[in-house]
A protein has these predicted regions:
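Conserved helicase ATPase motor motifs in RecA-like P-loop NTPase domains
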Residues: 1-20, 147, 174
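Interdomain hinge/linker at the junction between the two RecA-like core domains of SF2 helicases
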Residues: 11-60
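Conserved strand-helix element at the start of the C-terminal RecA-like helicase core
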Residues: 12-16, 58-84
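Conserved RecA-like helicase motor-core motifs
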Residues: 27-34, 87-103
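Conserved helicase motor
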Residues: 71-75, 92-106, 124-127
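Long, low-complexity intrinsically disordered regions enriched in Ser/Thr/Pro/Gly
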Residues: 98, 109-115, 166, 170-175
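Conserved two-lobed SF2 helicase motor
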Residues: 115-130
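Conserved SF2 helicase motif VI
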Residues: 141-167
Length: 175
């Protein structure tokens, strides 16, 4: 019943446009496309989980950098967090319906502020769309993907949570 509907999306696809048209039968859609600007972002691809893990640990342990990690596999999250815990790196892992832990619940209530408390945040698709980390606490984003549990568009969204990061390091399992 709305007189006007405005949709803004950086990666809207034809399926979404078709759905919107089906909701507004007989109406002409006005589509405004804006050419993307070069934000000077770089993506580095790794041949294995171990290779990216080694790179990430070098940057965290030796260079004292902060990293936002995103994974589509709970086992990857557990592996990475176990290593970071063994090395006494202050970290938090946000995985599926596990917000019963106080620090996880607090993080999900205010990820922008809470993320500043950690050298490493390990996230999954459990962090809802619409979450944006706008501060410059994180030096880079690392993505560990199996390719079996999230769609490429979702992986893209997961990687883009930390808006100011220009450096992305990725492993995507080809099996």
């Amino acid at each position: 019943n709305a007189e006007c509907v405005i949709v803004a999306d950086a990666n809207i696809n034809q399926q979404t446009l078709d759905f919107i048209e089906s909701c507004r039968l007989g109406e002409q859609l006005n589509i405004v496309e804006i050419d993307p600007k070069n934000e000077h972002k770089t993506a580095h691809l790794y041949n294995s989980f171990a290779e990216l893990q080694s790179f990430m640990l070098q940057r965290v342990m030796v260079e004292n950098q902060n990293v936002w990690i995103t994974c589509d596999s709970k086992s990857h999250v557990q592996t990475l967090q176990a290593i970071l815990n063994d090395l006494d790196v202050k970290n938090i892992a946000i995985v599926g319906n596990e917000n019963v832990k106080k620090e996880t619940a607090e993080f999900l209530q205010n990820p922008e502020a809470e993320s500043l408390k950690y050298q490493v945040v390990i996230s999954t698709s459990a962090i809802a769309s619409g979450v944006s980390i706008e501060h410059n606490h994180f030096d880079f984003v690392a993505g560990f993907f199996t390719g079996s549990s999230v769609q490429p568009t979702d992986a893209y969204q997961m990687l883009g949570r930390v808006r100011q990061c220009k450096e992305f390091h990725l492993f995507a399992d080809q099996n």
